[in-house]
Amino acid sequence: MPTPRPARTLVRGKQWTARKSVDTAKFEAIAGAILASLDAGPIAFGELSARVERLLPRFDGSVSWYTITCVRELEVRGQVVRQEKPVRYHLSGR
């Protein structure tokens, strides 16, 4: 009997022409780590990715790819705000 495929989540980013389909468990793990990492205030992407990697040291996949993909979805959902020049991320409402 074939192994069932893991659940997928469609993610979108502002100005993306197509959605990306990612493993739901990975999305939830990365999204949770992003939200926990942004609790301290606005940070650059490199620092955000490093914090996520520290929170998920055994993550199976590219932490930086999943971080940018998930942070853009959280931005569309209104949970995260991306500031321009220099680009910084922070929680919505801060």
Q: Where do the language-model regions lie?
A:
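Alpha-helix C-capping/helix-to-loop hinge sites
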Residues: 37, 55-59, 77
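A short, conserved structural fragment
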Residues: 75-84
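Alpha-helix N-cap and coil->helix boundary residues
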Residues: 43-47, 62, 66, 84
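Long, low-complexity, charged/polar intrinsically disordered regions in eukaryotic proteins
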Residues: 1-29
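Positively charged, polyanion-binding regions of nucleic-acid-associated proteins
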Residues: 23-42, 66, 70-76
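Short, positively charged loop/turn segments that connect secondary-structure elements
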Residues: 53-69
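Short, cationic-aromatic polyanion-contact patches
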Residues: 85-94
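Short acidic, hydrophobic short linear motifs in intrinsically disordered regions
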Residues: 42-54, 58
